[in-house]
From Swiss-Prot:
Record membrane topology: Peripheral membrane protein
Protein species of origin: Aromatoleum aromaticum (strain DSM 19018 / LMG 30748 / EbN1) (Azoarcus sp. (strain EbN1))
Domain 4Fe-4S ferredoxin-type: 52-82, 92-121
Name under which the protein is recorded: NADH-quinone oxidoreductase subunit I
Family designation: Belongs to the complex I 23 kDa subunit family.
Catalyzed reaction equations: a quinone + NADH + 5 H(+)(in) = a quinol + NAD(+) + 4 H(+)(out)
Length: 161
C-alpha cells in the first residue's frame, strides 16, 4: 500500500464519490409508472392473451396442421381436427391452458396461416383454475373483438417477418 492509497483511504474519497453519484440520481426525474392508473403503450410485438383469427369472409383460419401444438414447449395447446367433405381439415377442438403457457410466441411463429396470434391484452384473470383454460370459441371471440388491432400490429411488424 503506497502513500497515495493511504491518503485516499484516510479521506474516504471512494465513499464521497459514491455519495455524489447517489446524490445525482436522487434528484433526477422519476420514470416509474403507477400501473393500474397509468398505462404505457405496448409494443406491436407484445405477447399477451392468445386469439384465433378468421378470414374476412368469416371462416376460421386454422387449418389444423398442429404445428403450434408440436412446437409448444409447455404443452399448453390441445388440438383435435376433423376432415371436411371438401377434403380440407378444420379444428374440432382448440384449447390453450394459460396456466401452462409461457408466452414464448412459438405457436404464433409456427402458424403458416396466421391463425393463432398473441394480442396486446395483458389484463385477464380467473378466480378458478378452469377460468384460464381457453376453448376454441373463447379464442375466436378474443380474435373477433381485437381483429382491428391484431391486423394493425401484423402490418406494422410485416417488414421484420
Amino acid at each position: 500500500m503506497g502513500a497515495k492509497d493511504y491518503i485516499g483511504s484516510l479521506f474516504l474519497t471512494e465513499l464521497i464519490k459514491g455519495l455524489a453519484l447517489t446524490g445525482r440520481h436522487l434528484f433526477a426525474r422519476k420514470i416509474t409508472v403507477q400501473f393500474p392508473e397509468e398505462k404505457t403503450p405496448a409494443s406491436p410485438r407484445f405477447r399477451g392473451l392468445h386469439a384465433l383469427r378468421r378470414y374476412p369472409n368469416g371462416e376460421e383460419r386454422c387449418i389444423a396442421c398442429k404445428l403450434c401444438e408440436a412446437v409448444c414447449p409447455a404443452l399448453a395447446i390441445t388440438i383435435e381436427s376433423e376432415q371436411r367433405d371438401d377434403g380440407s381439415r378444420r379444428t374440432k377442438r382448440y384449447d390453450i391452458d394459460l396456466t401452462k403457457c409461457i408466452f414464448c410466441g412459438f405457436c404464433e411463429e409456427a402458424c403458416p396461416v396466421d391463425a393463432v396470434v398473441e394480442t396486446r391484452v395483458m389484463e385477464y384473470h380467473g378466480e378458478k383454475r378452469g377460468d384460464l383454460y381457453y376453448t376454441k370459441q373463447m379464442l375466436l371471440a378474443v380474435g373477433d373483438r381485437y381483429e382491428a388491432q391484431i391486423a394493425a400490429d401484423r402490418e406494422a411488424d410485416a417488414k421484420y417477418r
